[in-house]
UniProtKB/Swiss-Prot annotation:
GO terms for molecular function: GTP binding; metal ion binding; RNA ligase (GTP) activity. Its EC number is 6.5.1.8. One of its GO terms (cellular component) is nucleus. The active site is at H403 (gmp-histidine intermediate). It comes from Thalassiosira pseudonana (Marine diatom). Ligation probably proceeds through 3 nucleotidyl transfer steps, with 2',3'-cyclic phosphate termini being hydrolyzed to 3'-P termini in a step that precedes 3'-P activation with GMP. In the first nucleotidyl transfer step, RTCB reacts with GTP to form a covalent RTCB-histidine-GMP intermediate with release of PPi; in the second step, the GMP moiety is transferred to the RNA 3'-P; in the third step, the 5'-OH from the opposite RNA strand attacks the activated 3'-P to form a 3',5'-phosphodiester bond and release GMP. InterPro entries: RtcB, RtcB-like_sf, RtcB_euk. Mn(2+) 1 binds at D93, C96, H202. GMP binds at residues 201-205, 328-329, 377-380, 384, 403-406, 479. This is RNA-splicing ligase RtcB homolog. Mn(2+) 2 binds at C96, H234, H328. Belongs to the RtcB family.
Length: 480
């Protein structure tokens, strides 16, 4: 290890991590999980990568993943010729992320049959599920433009409001993007999937403000009223991003041999940042990130359309403004202080969220006094949170915090232990309208499959790396 591995956990979350390590050593984990080594070992392996600075960090929702554990944050010195970029440090769903849209509606406005009607309208308008085709027409020329320009393309085409990009991380566009570095196969997959939600843990939820912790910050975000209706969208770059990652991993195998990069886990395949392979992956990954922002923008367009259909009102009359949009899987060039010296770093965040503090130049003007909004999606049927970044987080975690609850059971374990009918019935009993393309897959996303999101949030709060603003409760869930 070149640097320490630091894990942010409380006692209960630590027990889960240690149990995972114990089970693996004893050979008792299910065959479905055998491709991934325990998260604790993964965090330690990342700490041995060339060019890493300060520490390999793991957020409270950490669990095992491909190469990097999910919840891992790692930064690499751009001025170090040995420093690397790793697709495993970003993930296959590049710029999987979350956005929150507020409204001026209240829970009373969406009671009873209206709630079901809204859920049905969202399900009808937003394509969901594995391999589903897009609801937004897209030519190859359109695709190249949006891969380069991000949300600006959606604004030009009428799928986003001009103001939306101001409330997106990076203003909804990575300037390091180059569509020419995205393979034909990746583009082919992306052409049919613009404006689609996908499956797995992706969702569109109607939520209501359940609790306000920071009145000032909530008011500035426009979500300060208990019972206020919001919409949360969670999805990413779909098949295009997956193909970009797959392509890069194949290329980097050869680059590692050429440059004599020695790894303790093959899933950490990487390339020197300054190498041709490293530069081209960064450019392709950035383009895939732009696709994800446009995808969430298009789904926002479809969600606004669905609400207008049900309430027979224009979406701006319902104050359907974007609160913020954050990435959960990304690598970005950022400025940070390390050992008292400002450095240009390539920060990998995999299953973690940027959380910049007040007065940071890269967050919107209207949030300068409170810090960057941080959107934390819960599990299906459980609460979500809005946080803000802190100065302590900027100093200790490269301005990063958690991204969700984090899996406690593998997908295979969930399918074995849980019954999908019971999961669906429990949601209905809790007053949550549910529309799902593949009912049998809901067990994989049941609350029992995940850690307690409240424990995760509270751990971040106590550590001081982010602060709670609002808790949101779901009243309708749309899934693949």
């Amino acid at each position: 290890m070149k640097v320490p591995a630091e894990i942010f956990v409380n006692n209960d979350l630590q027990t889960l991590l240690v149990q995972e390590l114990h089970d693996t050593c004893c050979g008792s984990r299910e065959e479905a999980d055998s491709a991934f080594i325990p998260a604790l070992r993964q965090a330690a392996n990342v700490a041995a990568l060339p060019g890493i600075v300060k520490a390999s960090l793991a957020m409270p929702d950490v669990h095992s993943g491909y190469g990097f554990c999910i919840g891992n944050v790692a930064a690499f010195d751009m001025d170090d010729p040995q420093a690397v970029i790793s697709p495993g440090g970003v993930g296959f769903d590049i710029n999987c992320g979350v956005r929150l849209i507020r409204t001026n509606l209240t829970e009373k406005d969406v009671e009873g049959s209206v709630r079901e009607e809204l859920a049905e309208a969202l399900f009808r308008n937003i394509p969901v599920g594995v391999g589903v085709s897009g609801g937004i027409p897209c030519s190859i020329d359109d695709l190249d433009q949006l891969l380069r320009n991000g949300v600006d393309w959606a604004i030009e085409k009428g799928y986003a409001w001009e103001e939306d990009k101001d409330h997106c991380e990076e203003n909804g566009c990575m300037e390091t993007a180059d569509p020419n570095c995205v393979s034909k196969r990746a583009k082919k997959r992306g052409l049919k999937q613009l404006g689609t939600l996908g499956a797995g843990n992706h969702y569109t939820e109607i939520q209501v403000v359940d609790e306000v912790y920071n009145t000032e910050a909530a008011k500035i975000m426009g979500i300060g009223t208990v019972g206020q209706v919001c919409i949360m969208i969670h999805t990413g770059s779909r098949g295009l991003g997956h193909q970009v990652a797959t392509d890069a991993l194949q290329v980097m195998e050869e680059a590692m041999c050429r440059d004599a990069i020695d790894l303790n886990d093959r899933q950490l395949s990487c390339a020197r940042i300054s190498s041709k392979e490293g530069r081209e992956y960064l450019a392709a990954m950035s383009a895939a990130a732009n696709f994800a922002w446009v995808n969430r923008s298009c789904i926002t367009y479809l969600a606004r359309k669905a609400f207008s259909e049900v309430f027979q009102r224009e979406s701006d009359d319902m104050d359907m403004h974007l609160v913020y949009d954050v990435c959960h899987n990304i690598a970005k060039v950022e400025q940070h202080i390390v050992d008292g010296e400002q450095k240009t770093l390539l920060v990998h965040r995999k299953g973690s969220t940027r959380a910049y503090p007040p007065c940071h130049p890269d967050i919107p003007k209207d949030y300068q006094t409170i810090g960057q909004p941080v959107l934390i999606g819960g599990t299906m049927g459980t609460c979500s949170y809005v946080l803000v970044g802190t100065d302590k987080g900027m100093a200790e975690t490269f301005g990063s915090t958690c991204h969700g609850a984090g899996r406690a059971l593998s997908r295979n374990q969930s399918r074995i232990k849980l019954d999908h009918n019971q999961v669906l019935n429990k949601l209905k009993e809790d007053g949550i309208a549910i529309r799902v393309a593949s009912p049998k897959l809901v067990t994989e996303e049941a609350p029992e499959s995940y850690k307690n999101v409240c424990d995760v949030i509270e751990t971040c709060q106590v550590a001081g790396i982010s602060e709670k603003v609002v808790k949101l409760r779901p009243i309708a869930v749309i899934k693949g």
